[in-house]
From Swiss-Prot:
It comes from Arabidopsis thaliana (Mouse-ear cress). It is found in: Nucleus. Gene3D superfamilies: Homeodomain-like (1.10.10.60). The SR/KY and BELL domains are responsive for the interaction between the TALE/BELL proteins and the TALE/KNOX proteins. This is Homeobox protein BEL1 homolog. The gene is BEL1. A motif (Bipartite nuclear localization) lies at residues 275-290. InterPro entries: HD (IPR001356), Homeodomain-like_sf (IPR009057), KN_HD (IPR008422), POX_dom (IPR006563), TALE_homeobox (IPR050224). The keyword Transcription applies. Residues 391-453 bind DNA. PROSITE patterns: HOMEOBOX_1, HOMEOBOX_2. Pfam families: Homeobox_KN, POX. One of its GO terms (cellular component) is nucleus.
Length: 611
């Protein structure tokens, strides 16, 4: 009846497997009588059912029957007597104990093994490199040889026991085949996780080192694995350090706009650096122009707003915008200036060196700075174009660029060509020479260049002076303006304005004073003439050089000479009638004769004005 219920639950798909298993179990009795073949049949039975989760135990420790197995047999054999059931549990040689993984269907098997084959234990290993060496042994079913001496059971009891065993095996097959696919997928998933796990290789190494469970690897393979691990660790560390450095550089560039990561400018050529610098300078000029345009537009907008609102009304609104935009433009300017400085350093123009030179060097001029820059550019050109001096031409003296720099300094300080210690140090640094070489060059230059030039200049000056002495007619003999403007207290004008100041002088002294005061010798004519030569009274006449056409004398000023009694040279107004100062007016017209008294009043002041 239980067998009919079992077949009611199974489908047509498992009928073939059931027939095969029935045939195998029916041949079980034959294998018991032939002990040499029972091992082969046992492998066939439990090899086909190894995936069903069956565990078969042949240990000698299980001589005592399990109570669950006895209860199960008691449930299926209720019609049998107590004596028959006990005889089945104790004396049956073909019964088997079958224990499922889930402990659902326990059964009894023979608890004795053949004496000629010892039992083997269970060996586990996590190694995946050499699975054949893992000593995991499958359980085998080895029924005990029938002891024909003490066996007295009948055929019916054996047939019932065989049917019972067959029924349990088929039920186990049907139960585990339904879940076969799910278990297979779950097993593959866990196998993939174990294979790809990073703990697999350390576990294998530990097992091979301490347990030696079938993992046989050569020392070379172990060393290769360790070397690969070290390389991976180094690569990971390098990646971490580079990642952290990139993050730090990004933070620094975000905080400060002027600081930036300088590109490898040394790999660029000289012409590319020049183009880069020119482009950056043009961008800086464009930035300044746009910033000025923005400020102009803001000023216009603020003026329009203030015209509508009032003075100071736009400052509240434009201050924030102006501050933000000025910050933006300043950041851009700092970035461009940083790029220009980096490019200039790549070109060899070191601003720090130039600044130190400008502070220390007292005689440096813009011309020398330009010369230094030109020499640096020429040097870079030579380095790029590989234009070197010919090896077969020996170098005589100092290098040409050094001599050019020293000569330029000499001409800049021509009046005092004696460099100080600081100047020598700077020139030695610029030219690449030593201080002794710079000093020796200046000593030789002062003798060979500077001294001949000074002597030539002195010779030219002396030659011009000799030409002036030998040819006086070629020289302009006009008096100097200072000599004409000079006014002394002993001059004629002072005597006329102050007639009593010089009353005590004699005639000789008066005559010499007049001659010394009015020096008209430069005009080429005799300025002072005595009236005694042309007139009976001997008056003094002063000819001013205004000649008439007929060759006679011009305008003359007649002064009465001093009397023998020591009288005065000039008389007062009360004595004018006795000895007046007479003016000859040979060149005066009739109209001018009428104005003669006014001229008499003016006296010598007119003469001073004419002069």
């Amino acid at each position: 009846m239980a067998r009919d219920q079992f077949y009611g639950h199974n489908n047509h798909h498992h009928q073939e497997q059931q027939h095969q298993m029935i045939n195998q179990i029916q041949g079980f009795d034959e294998t018991n009588q032939n002990p040499t073949d029972h091992h082969h049949y046992n492998h066939q039975i439990f090899g086909s059912n190894s995936n069903m989760g069956m565990m078969i135990d042949f240990s000698k420790q299980q001589q005592i029957r399990m109570t669950s197995g006895s209860d199960h047999h008691h449930h299926h054999h209720q019609t049998s007597g107590g004596t028959d059931q006990n005889q089945l549990l104790e004396d049956s040689s073909s019964a088997m104990r079958l224990c499922n993984v889930n402990n659902d269907f326990p059964s009894e098997v023979n608890d004795e093994r053949p004496p000629q084959r010892p039992s083997q234990g269970l060996s586990l290993s996590l190694s995946s490199s050499n699975p054949t060496s893992i000593s995991l042994q499958s359980f085998e079913l080895r029924p005990q040889q029938q002891q024909q001496q003490g066996y007295s059971g009948n055929k019916s009891t054996q047939h019932q026991n065989l049917q019972h065993t067959q029924m349990m095996m088929m039920m186990m097959n049907s139960h585990h085949q339904n879940n076969n696919n799910n278990n297979h997928q779950h097993h593959n998933h866990h196998q993939f996780q174990i294979g790809s796990s990073k703990y697999l290789s350390p576990a294998q190494e530990l097992l091979s080192e301490f347990c030696s469970l079938g993992v046989k690897e050569s020392d070379e393979e172990v060393m290769m694995m360790k070397h690969k691990k070290k390389q991976k660790g180094k690569q990971q560390e390098e990646w971490d350090t580079s990642h952290h450095s990139n993050n730090d550089q990004h933070d620094q560039s975000a905080t400060t706009s002027s600081k930036k990561h300088v590109p490898p400018l040394h790999s660029l050529e000289f012409m590319e650096l020049q183009k880069r610098k020119a482009k950056l300078l043009s961008m800086l000029e464009e930035l300044k122009r746009r910033y000025g345009h923005y400020r102009e537009q803001m000023r216009v907008a603020a003026a329009a707003f203030e015209a509508a609102v009032g003075l100071g009304g736009a400052e509240i609104y434009t201050a924030l915008a102006s501050r933000a935009m000025s910050r933006h433009f300043r950041c851009l300017k700092d970035g461009l200036v940083g790029q220009i400085q980096a490019t200039s350093q790549a070109l060899g123009e070191r601003e720090e060196d130039n600044r130190a030179v400008s502070i220390a060097a007292r005689g440096e001029t813009p011309r020398l700075r330009l010369l230094d820059q030109a020499l640096r550019q020429q040097k870079s050109y030579r380095q790029m174009t590989l234009v070197d001096a010919h090896p077969w031409r020996p170098q005589r003296g100092l290098p040409e660029r050094a001599v050019t720099t020293l000569r330029a300094w000499l001409f800049e300080h021509f009046l005092h060509p004696y460099p100080s210690d600081v100047d020598k140090h700077i020139l030695a640094r610029q030219t690449g020479l030593s201080r002794s070489q710079v000093s020796n060059w200046f000593i030789n230059a002062r003798v060979r260049l500077w001294k001949p030039m000074i002597e030539e200049m002195y010779c030219e000056e002396t030659r011009s002076e000799q030409m002036e002495i030998t040819n006086p007619m070629m020289i302009d003999t006009k008096p100097d303006p200072d000599q004409l403007i000079r006014v002394e207290p002993e001059s004629l004008s002072s005597i006329v304005t102050n007639p009593t100041s010089k009353s005590g002088h004699n005639s000789t002294h008066g005559t010499m004073s007049l001659g010394s005061t009015f020096d008209f010798s430069l005009y080429g004519n005799q300025a002072v003439t005595y009236a005694g030569e042309g007139g009976p009274r001997g008056d003094v006449s002063l000819t001013l050089g205004l000649q008439r056409n007929d060759g006679n004398g011009g305008v003359s000023l007649a002064l009465s000479p001093v009397t023998a009694q020591g009288g005065q040279l000039f008389y007062g107004r009360d004595h004018i009638e006795e000895g007046p100062v007479q003016y000859s007016a040979s060149m005066l017209d009739d109209d001018q004769v009428q104005n003669l008294p006014y001229r008499n009043l003016m006296g010598a002041q007119l003469l001073h004005d004419i002069v």
